């Protein structure tokens, strides 16, 4: 554990941020799992609807730095291709 007061505060802040980011990352994954489930079921309409809900969330977290913008683009591209192939 840190001995300097500012380092102690920083450790507390870092832990809060880690938990907050973990929650957001989990939510993001959940939305994309819904899209994947719809694709695997072969339901194009449900997959498109779930994808339209998940896309802005992915973009938002890419903008905020939770994930890299290229990773967001890669996920969107791959999912869109899978939906198109249905």
UniProtKB/Swiss-Prot annotation:
Pfam families per the UniProt record, alphabetical: Ribosomal_S20p
SUPFAM superfamilies reported for this sequence: Ribosomal protein S20
GO biological process: translation
Keywords (A to Z) from UniProt: Ribonucleoprotein, Ribosomal protein, RNA-binding, rRNA-binding
GO cellular component, one term: small ribosomal subunit
GO molecular function terms attached to this record: small ribosomal subunit rRNA binding; structural constituent of ribosome
Compositional bias ranges of the Basic residues kind: 1-11
Segments of this protein annotated with the region Disordered: 1-26
Domain of life: Bacteria
Family to which this protein belongs: Belongs to the bacterial ribosomal protein bS20 family.
Function: Binds directly to 16S ribosomal RNA.
Name by which UniProt lists this protein: Small ribosomal subunit protein bS20
